[in-house]
UniProtKB/Swiss-Prot annotation:
Chain positions with N-acetylglycine modification: 2
Coiled coil: 61-87, 126-267
UniProt cross-references to InterPro entries, sorted A to Z: Cavin_fam (IPR026752)
Compartmental location: Cytoplasm, Cytosol; Membrane, Caveola
GO cellular component labels: caveola; cytoplasm; cytosol; membrane raft; nucleoplasm
Region (Disordered): 1-42, 198-242, 256-381
Domain comment as written in the entry: The leucine-zipper domain is essential for its localization in the caveolae.
Compositional bias (Basic and acidic residues): 219-242, 302-320
A GO molecular-function annotation: phosphatidylserine binding
Gene this protein is translated from: Cavin2
Protein name: Caveolae-associated protein 2
Location of region: Leucine-zipper: 62-100
Its job: Plays an important role in caveolar biogenesis and morphology. Regulates caveolae morphology by inducing membrane curvature within caveolae. Plays a role in caveola formation in a tissue-specific manner. Required for the formation of caveolae in the lung and fat endothelia but not in the heart endothelia. Negatively regulates the size or stability of CAVIN complexes in the lung endothelial cells. May play a role in targeting PRKCA to caveolae.
Acidic residues biased stretches: 202-218, 367-376
Amino acid sequence: MGEDAAQAEKFQHPNTDMLQEKPSNPSPMPSSTPSPSLNLGSTEEAIRDNSQVNAVTVHTLLDKLVNMLDAVRENQHNMEQRQINLEGSVKGIQNDLTKLSKYQASTSNTVSKLLEKSRKVSAHTRAVRERLEKQCVQVKRLENNHAQLLRRNHFKVLIFQEESEIPASVFVKEPVPSTAEGKELADENKSLEETLHNVDLSSDDELPGDEEALEDSAEEKMEESRAEKIKRSSLKKVDSLKKAFSRQNIEKKMNKLGTKIVSVERREKIKKSLTPNHQKASSGKSSPFKVSPLSFGRKKIREGESSAENETKLEEQVQDDHEEGSFTEGLSEASLPSGLLEGSAEDAEKSALRGNNSGVGSNADLTIEEDEEEESVALQQAQQVRYESGYMLNSKEMEESSEKHVQAAVLHVDQTA
């Protein structure tokens, strides 16, 4: 740029140089005078030369300016590209920084977790150390106690008797035992407990720690022995129940019941003893069948008999009447439906109560009056029952009984003292 400016100055001031050169030329010819025509021609040429020089300089300057502008444009374009590259690199750096921040957060979380775990582990290690220290102390105590026991040569032997069985008399419940029997049972229980207890064969010179340990073991064994006692007692109770409900016991009970059943000879006697005079017709409305009434005999007192004998005879008669009533009830229950059995049971209870009252009471007159309709219905039902059971009376006896029962039946019982 400085060179271009210097050249432009040179082109602008060529006249000055020419003027300086021209005065030097006319000096050798001082006598000659310049002509005006020559001066005019020279000035025109100089002007032309100056104009040409100026145009060239301007053209060159313009070219240089264009070149300079092109260079500036290229430089700007390069700068723009560099700026774009810088922006991309800056963005990459920012992304890398965000990733680094994320990694740092994750690492901080992991580090915090590791710190928490290390704290927990340290707490566990402390607890384990404390436990180990306590165990070491206990082991040292046990070693000392063991050494002392070995020095003294005293041992405690625990004997557990598994084979000793409990007698069955302990579990059998007797009805209201006396004081002596209660004492004997208490002594037996004490002896059993003593046999089941542990046997102490050591002296009392041992340390309290050993005694506590041995007492704990003894209590555990006692609890085991109690559980075994309960098991044995339950098994024995089950065996006793099985024996109670065995076939032999059931057969014995059935035999006892069979002896109570009325035999064939007794039935024949009951047939003969039945008379229509002493039959009592139950109400036809309440019960549909007839129950045999109680028979009250009237006997005279002989001279050699006492009142006690008369009472025994009356009781025997009452028992016979009860047996007859039970026999007739059984026959009626076998033949009639279950709906009719309720009336028979009620009539049997009423007749039994009347019989007992008649045997116990003193001089009493029992009067039984019944309607004709009720008696006829009762007689018909009694005939049906006896026909079904195979114990029918003869037609003549039934006619006589019907004729006698049409009238009101009155029974007088006189008990002599």
